Regions:
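Charged low-complexity interaction tracts in eukaryotic proteins
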Residues: 4-24, 30, 73-135
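Short coil/loop linkers at secondary-structure junctions
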Residues: 49, 64-65, 169
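Positively charged, polyanion-binding regions of nucleic-acid-associated proteins
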Residues: 23-50
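Extended alpha-helical interaction scaffolds used for oligomerization/partner binding
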Residues: 130-200
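Charge-enriched amphipathic alpha-helical scaffolds
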Residues: 59-95, 99, 187-200
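Non-catalytic, well-ordered alpha-helical scaffold segments
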Residues: 33-37, 52, 69-72, 156, ...
Length: 200
């Protein structure tokens, strides 16, 4: 059973306090910034990813970046960041989970938890038993931008359609494309909902 009414999020620390805690690990500022980019990118790309899988991806793409202890220490502090993700365990999301081990916590895109956790639950259900697409390091880190979309022939064709057929250009095209991209990525979107963007 989910904690629909009240989720107690970890306390948010100031940037100064966060930096001081990261240095206690000790992590260089560049290392903590890179890990933060990884976490944001994974939240944007996957929506939800367990820390043990995030660790596996970071270790495969940046093998000498951190040790397992440093990764866990970073994740514990990062729970107190104000970023595009939460790091929460089942014990914080559900009433029937007593304790979540640190590596079982999940990096969760902030858009999946609002007044309810229905989007989170729906996303988690849709991910079951599916493999993770893991791009190379450069491409994964591009997902740090929540509106990043890989350049594909389909993206080019859609943008051309929006320009030529819908008469969109400049900022209006960018806004419409971002809205459409967000709608497509949302697990709760329907075909009708996505197509309604073309009526605007």
């Amino acid at each position: 059973m989910s904690k629909e009414q009240y989720i107690e999020f970890p306390e948010e620390y100031t940037r100064r306090e966060l930096n001081a805690r990261y240095r206690e690990i000790p992590l260089k500022d560049t290392t903590s910034r890179l890990l933060r980019k990884y976490f944001n990118a994974m939240a944007n790309l996957y929506g939800i990813i367990p820390l043990h899988k995030a660790k596996e991806i970071v270790f495969s793409l940046s093998p000498k970046l951190v040790t397992e202890d440093e990764f866990l220490a970073f994740a514990e502090i990062a729970r107190h960041e104000c970023e595009g993700y939460y790091i929460l365990g089942g014990d914080e999301l559900y009433t029937d989970v007593k304790h979540t081990k640190p590596l079982e916590r999940e990096i969760i895109d902030v858009t999946l938890i609002g007044e309810s956790i229905d989007l989170f639950i729906e996303t988690k259900r849709s991910q079951q038993e599916k493999p993770y697409y893991v791009p190379d390091k450069k491409h994964l880190l591009e997902y740090d931008d929540p509106f990043y979309c890989e350049d594909t022939p389909e993206k080019t064709a859609l943008r051309r359609f929006m320009e030529e057929r819908l008469g969109l250009s400049g900022e209006k095209l960018e806004d419409a494309f971002d809205d459409l991209l967000y709608g497509v990525r949302s697990v709760s979107s329907s075909v009708e909902g996505v197509l309604s963007h073309f009526d605007k």
